[in-house]
Amino acid sequence: VVETIGLPNRDLFIFCDDTDYCLRAHIAGFSLYYIPAALMDKHKFFSSDTWTTRNQKKKWKRYYQLRNETYMSHHYGQNWGVRHLRGFVMLLGYWIPALLSMPFTNAWTMSDLPVLWRAYRDGIEEKLGKR
Protein backbone atom coordinates (compact mmCIF):
# COMPACT_ATOMS: atom_id res chain seq x y z
CA VAL A 1 0.00 0.00 0.00
CA VAL A 2 2.77 2.45 0.95
CA GLU A 3 4.55 1.86 -2.36
CA THR A 4 1.32 2.65 -4.24
CA ILE A 5 -0.27 5.53 -2.30
CA GLY A 6 2.52 6.68 0.02
CA LEU A 7 2.29 7.37 3.73
CA PRO A 8 -0.68 8.86 5.59
CA ASN A 9 -1.13 12.61 5.09
CA ARG A 10 0.69 14.19 8.05
CA ASP A 11 -1.09 17.50 7.37
CA LEU A 12 -4.32 15.97 8.65
CA PHE A 13 -3.08 16.55 12.18
CA ILE A 14 -5.06 14.53 14.78
CA PHE A 15 -8.32 13.95 12.88
CA CYS A 16 -9.15 12.09 9.64
CA ASP A 17 -5.64 10.94 8.75
CA ASP A 18 -6.77 7.31 9.01
CA THR A 19 -9.97 7.93 7.04
CA ASP A 20 -8.06 9.72 4.28
CA TYR A 21 -5.55 6.88 4.09
CA CYS A 22 -8.31 4.27 3.82
CA LEU A 23 -10.08 6.27 1.11
CA ARG A 24 -6.87 6.63 -0.87
CA ALA A 25 -6.18 2.90 -0.53
CA HIS A 26 -9.72 2.04 -1.62
CA ILE A 27 -9.53 4.39 -4.62
CA ALA A 28 -6.22 2.72 -5.57
CA GLY A 29 -7.99 -0.66 -5.59
CA PHE A 30 -6.97 -2.12 -2.24
CA SER A 31 -9.44 -4.08 -0.09
CA LEU A 32 -10.27 -2.72 3.35
CA TYR A 33 -11.31 -4.86 6.30
CA TYR A 34 -13.42 -3.83 9.27
CA ILE A 35 -12.44 -5.55 12.54
CA PRO A 36 -15.27 -4.95 15.04
CA ALA A 37 -13.42 -6.68 17.89
CA ALA A 38 -10.42 -4.32 17.66
CA LEU A 39 -9.84 -2.24 20.79
CA MET A 40 -8.23 1.11 21.39
CA ASP A 41 -6.99 2.02 24.86
CA LYS A 42 -7.46 5.76 25.23
CA HIS A 43 -6.28 7.82 28.16
CA LYS A 44 -9.25 9.00 30.21
CA PHE A 45 -8.51 12.67 29.72
CA PHE A 46 -11.99 13.84 30.77
CA SER A 47 -12.95 11.19 33.33
CA SER A 48 -13.78 13.43 36.30
CA ASP A 49 -14.25 16.79 34.60
CA THR A 50 -17.39 18.89 34.43
CA TRP A 51 -18.99 19.65 31.06
CA THR A 52 -17.46 23.15 31.09
CA THR A 53 -13.97 21.86 31.88
CA ARG A 54 -14.21 19.16 29.19
CA ASN A 55 -15.21 21.77 26.61
CA GLN A 56 -12.35 24.06 27.59
CA LYS A 57 -9.80 21.23 27.38
CA LYS A 58 -10.81 20.12 23.91
CA LYS A 59 -11.22 23.58 22.40
CA TRP A 60 -7.90 23.43 20.55
CA LYS A 61 -8.90 20.11 18.95
CA ARG A 62 -12.14 21.50 17.54
CA TYR A 63 -10.32 23.55 14.91
CA TYR A 64 -8.62 20.43 13.53
CA GLN A 65 -11.74 18.29 13.70
CA LEU A 66 -13.89 20.83 11.85
CA ARG A 67 -11.17 21.72 9.35
CA ASN A 68 -10.18 18.14 8.55
CA GLU A 69 -13.73 16.81 8.28
CA THR A 70 -14.64 19.77 6.05
CA TYR A 71 -11.53 19.05 3.95
CA MET A 72 -12.52 15.38 3.61
CA SER A 73 -16.02 16.30 2.46
CA HIS A 74 -14.74 18.97 0.08
CA HIS A 75 -11.91 16.87 -1.34
CA TYR A 76 -13.75 13.57 -1.77
CA GLY A 77 -17.38 14.73 -1.98
CA GLN A 78 -19.28 13.77 -5.11
CA ASN A 79 -21.72 16.70 -5.17
CA TRP A 80 -22.02 20.36 -4.13
CA GLY A 81 -24.01 19.58 -0.98
CA VAL A 82 -21.41 17.23 0.41
CA ARG A 83 -18.51 19.39 -0.74
CA HIS A 84 -19.83 22.60 0.85
CA LEU A 85 -22.79 22.02 3.15
CA ARG A 86 -21.62 19.06 5.22
CA GLY A 87 -18.82 21.07 6.84
CA PHE A 88 -21.10 24.09 7.26
CA VAL A 89 -23.68 21.98 9.11
CA MET A 90 -20.89 20.82 11.41
CA LEU A 91 -19.86 24.45 11.93
CA LEU A 92 -23.43 25.30 12.94
CA GLY A 93 -23.35 22.30 15.27
CA TYR A 94 -20.62 24.11 17.21
CA TRP A 95 -21.86 27.70 16.83
CA ILE A 96 -25.45 27.15 18.00
CA PRO A 97 -24.62 25.37 21.29
CA ALA A 98 -21.81 27.88 21.88
CA LEU A 99 -24.14 30.85 21.47
CA LEU A 100 -26.84 29.25 23.62
CA SER A 101 -24.46 28.33 26.44
CA MET A 102 -22.37 31.53 26.59
CA PRO A 103 -24.69 33.35 29.01
CA PHE A 104 -24.57 30.43 31.45
CA THR A 105 -21.04 29.02 31.30
CA ASN A 106 -17.51 30.00 30.36
CA ALA A 107 -16.99 26.93 28.13
CA TRP A 108 -17.29 29.18 25.04
CA THR A 109 -16.47 32.81 24.31
CA MET A 110 -17.26 35.06 21.36
CA SER A 111 -13.61 34.79 20.29
CA ASP A 112 -14.13 31.06 19.66
CA LEU A 113 -16.61 31.69 16.84
CA PRO A 114 -14.13 33.21 14.32
CA VAL A 115 -11.71 30.34 15.00
CA LEU A 116 -14.42 27.86 14.03
CA TRP A 117 -15.23 29.89 10.90
CA ARG A 118 -11.54 29.84 9.95
CA ALA A 119 -11.50 26.05 10.42
CA TYR A 120 -14.44 25.72 8.02
CA ARG A 121 -12.84 28.05 5.45
CA ASP A 122 -9.46 26.30 5.74
CA GLY A 123 -11.19 22.97 5.10
CA ILE A 124 -12.99 24.29 2.01
CA GLU A 125 -9.78 25.89 0.74
CA GLU A 126 -7.89 22.67 1.60
CA LYS A 127 -5.36 24.51 3.78
CA LEU A 128 -3.95 21.76 5.97
CA GLY A 129 -1.05 21.32 8.38
CA LYS A 130 -0.52 22.27 11.98
CA ARG A 131 -1.73 25.78 12.81
Regions found by a protein language model. Give the residues of each.
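Active-site Gly/Thr loop motif
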Residues: 66
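Non-catalytic, C-terminal membrane-associated alpha-helical segments of glycosyltransferases
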Residues: 78-131
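Active-site donor/metal-binding and catalytic loop motifs
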Residues: 35-54
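A short acidic, glycine-rich active-site loop
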Residues: 53-63
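A bilobed periplasmic-binding-protein/Venus flytrap-type ligand-binding module shared by bacterial periplasmic
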Residues: 72-74
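A short, mixed-charge helix-start or loop-turn motif at secondary-structure junctions
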Residues: 4, 51-55, 102, 106
